[in-house]
């Protein structure tokens, strides 16, 4: 099981840790229009899933912008940003950030994604910062559980993993 801290305090993660080589677990989250979205909806594509505690914080904002900017240069890679923010807040953030094309997904309803990927923080009911790359065959090819939730992920390694999965 991955272990993380939030501002130096140890946190409990719910669900199972996902590892490279695993079949990617399915999940159901909500799009900004409240429609359900599952992993199967992007079947056959390479997915870079960027997980953030809240889109309205500085590191989460930077992470979402960075991965969406990088993905613009990667044909065949779909970037999905998952948080427990309400879909309305995610939609507002996308409009304010000028990233209307960004795919932000909300796990607020039942933590389906958080539990399936082992990133649901029990004490805070937030998601731990993490990055997953899933290839077109639904195999997990890259995993990073960021050990301190307020730190940035390794952007370069994640982008390289997404390129390698094409």
From Swiss-Prot:
Report the GO molecular function annotations.
Answer: thioredoxin peroxidase activity
Q: Which Gene3D superfamilies match?
A: Glutaredoxin
Concerning InterPro entries, the annotation shows:
Redoxin, Thioredoxin-like_sf, Thioredoxin_domain, TPX, Tpx_CS, Tpx_Peroxidase_subfamily
- Supply the alphabetized keyword list: Antioxidant, Disulfide bond, Oxidoreductase, Peroxidase, Redox-active center
Disulfide topology: 60-94
Q: Where is the Thioredoxin domain?
A: 18-164
Which EC numbers does the record give?
A: 1.11.1.24
Classification via Pfam families = Redoxin (PF08534)
Question: Per the record, what are the reactions this protein catalyses?
Answer: a hydroperoxide + [thioredoxin]-dithiol = an alcohol + [thioredoxin]-disulfide + H2O
Which PROSITE patterns does the protein's record reference? THIOREDOXIN_2 (PS51352), TPX (PS01265)
The entry assigns this protein to a family as follows: Belongs to the peroxiredoxin family. Tpx subfamily.
Subunit description: Homodimer.
Known NCBIfam families for this protein? PRK00522.1
Q: What else is known?
A: The active site is a conserved redox-active cysteine residue, the peroxidatic cysteine (C(P)), which makes the nucleophilic attack on the peroxide substrate. The peroxide oxidizes the C(P)-SH to cysteine sulfenic acid (C(P)-SOH), which then reacts with another cysteine residue, the resolving cysteine (C(R)), to form a disulfide bridge. The disulfide is subsequently reduced by an appropriate electron donor to complete the catalytic cycle. In this atypical 2-Cys peroxiredoxin, C(R) is present in the same subunit to form an intramolecular disulfide.
**What is the purpose of this protein?**
Thiol-specific peroxidase that catalyzes the reduction of hydrogen peroxide and organic hydroperoxides to water and alcohols, respectively. Plays a role in cell protection against oxidative stress by detoxifying peroxides.
Its name, as the record gives it, is Thiol peroxidase
Q: What organism is this sequence from? A: Halalkalibacterium halodurans (strain ATCC BAA-125 / DSM 18197 / FERM 7344 / JCM 9153 / C-125) (Bacillus halodurans)
Q: What is the lineage of its organism?
A: Bacteria, Bacillati, Bacillota, Bacilli, Bacillales
State the gene name recorded for this protein.
tpx
């Amino acid at each position: 099981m991955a272990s993380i801290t939030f501002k130096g305090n140890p946190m409990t993660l719910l669900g199972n840790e996902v590892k490279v080589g695993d079949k990617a677990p399915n999940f159901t989250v909500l799009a900004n229009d409240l429609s359900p979205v599952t992993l199967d909806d992007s079947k056959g594509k390479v997915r870079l899933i960027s997980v953030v505690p809240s889109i309205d914080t500085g590191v989460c904002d930077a992470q979402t912008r960075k991965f969406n900017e990088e993905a613009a240069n990667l044909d065949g890679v779909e970037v999905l940003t998952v948080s427990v923010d309400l879909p309305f807040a995610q939609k507002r953030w996308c409009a304010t950030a000028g990233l209307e094309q960004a795919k932000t997904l909300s796990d607020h309803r039942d933590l389906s994604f958080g539990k399936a990927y082992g990133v649901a923080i029990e004490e805070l009911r937030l998601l731990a910062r993490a990055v997953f790359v899933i290839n077109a065959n639904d195999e997990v090819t890259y995993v990073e559980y960021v050990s301190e939730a307020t730190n940035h992920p390794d952007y370069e390694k994640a982008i390289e993993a997404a390129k390698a999965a094409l």
